[in-house]
Amino acid sequence: MIIVKRIAKGIAILVGVVLLAGVTFIASDWRFYKRLATFDRMNSMTDMAWYEPVVEVKPGTPPEISRATADTRTLSPELVDALEFYAKENGSMSLLVWHKGALQMEWYGEGFDQSSYMESASMHKSVVALLYGIAIDQGYIPSVDEPASTYLIEWKDDARSKITIRNMLQMAHGLARASGGFNPLGDNMKLGMGTDWGGIALKSLAEDPPNTVFAYSNLNSQLLGLILQRATGMPYAEFLQKNLWSKVGESSARVWLDRPGGLAKTSGSLFTPPRNWLRLGILHLNKGRVGDEQVVPEAWIEQVITPSPNNPNYGFQTWLGTEYRPKVDYGKGVAAHVPHSEPFEAQDVVYFDGANGQRVYVIASEELVIVRMGEGGLDFQTGAFRWDEPKLPNLVIRGLRQVANEGESLEPWTPSEGP
């Protein structure tokens, strides 16, 4: 009996030690483990309270967006109906169409309106590209061909010292992906939800020579945010607000941080209502201008939309429709692809691409910007997204051309109250 009691006491002590070790382990990075434990119970598109801490990026007073009148209306009632049907069928939360200087359509799903904040996912990358043009123009960075190691001094003495900022903007960095896959303790998960995004990203070593392989990577875009912060000497959100959002934003944005006072998530998670994404698309269409002010250098916009050597469908953190491929993939190490059942109707489609089908399409030749936000993401069985990439812009372009050719007179469009 004494032996049994001693064994029981020993087991109790062991269990206590294990529990204490577990509590200590979790407490050492409680914010990460809280995110990890609650992620599968939240809606990543709309549960803004889950993303904390955040920094508010205050807006300015940009020019009003004109709404189409009887004289400027270009969408037929049939096209509006088709677009609303498309939006509802694909789990959309918002769909905006701006054409020839006027907002032709502004649709929101049930429970959403023009003040609703939504997760932008990787569309944020295309905003980072704009900020690089501003930083170079203001002299914070000498040129796009500056070695990244000028700012990432951790790279000075190894093969990564050959990587330029251009390589990173074009996703031709040659870096290995974060390890661990979906292992909750792996670097990949910590890059997504951890509390030291910069530290995790800096661990990645060179795998290929720079400018040889296209490899779309959140890790790369996170490092671009770190470079921008170190080069300017400002927190990312401050530089964004001072140089872009105060010019283009009609309402505030929110930037997610890994921890209080930490690094901004620059591979995704710029939270703002859809109308601000429309304004960013219009800025692109107007070659960097907002009203009478040149906010982003025109020459930089041209560089952003120039096809890169390793992927003709990618410029600087921004996607291009310049070459037709039935399946557009994300490069080395990513199985997912987006189906393209046909070419784009226009040859100059530029678009911001975010997970779950967050899109801003900019088509200068048609004087057209389309914003779509909502659900409808990846089919994990096939590795394909659940809709054709060209379907939405082609639907709009064909409808606009039909109206133009037939010379129809249209009634002003009135926004619906949702599905």
Each language-model region and where it sits:
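N-terminal leader/targeting segments and the immediately adjacent pre-domain N-terminus
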Residues: 2-112, 138-141, 397-419
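Short, small/polar residue-rich loop motifs at catalytic or cofactor-binding pockets
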Residues: 89-92, 116, 355-357
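Active-site SXXK
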Residues: 101, 118-143, 168, 224-228, ...
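Catalytic-site signature segments of enzymes, centered on catalytic residues
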Residues: 115, 182-268
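Active-site helix/loop module of the DD-peptidase/beta-lactamase fold
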Residues: 138-176, 203, 232-268, 272
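Active-site-proximal alpha-helical segments within enzyme catalytic domains
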Residues: 220-227, 266, 270-290, 358-374
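Active-site Gly/Thr loop motif
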Residues: 251-254, 306-369
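C-terminal/domain-terminus segments
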Residues: 371-403
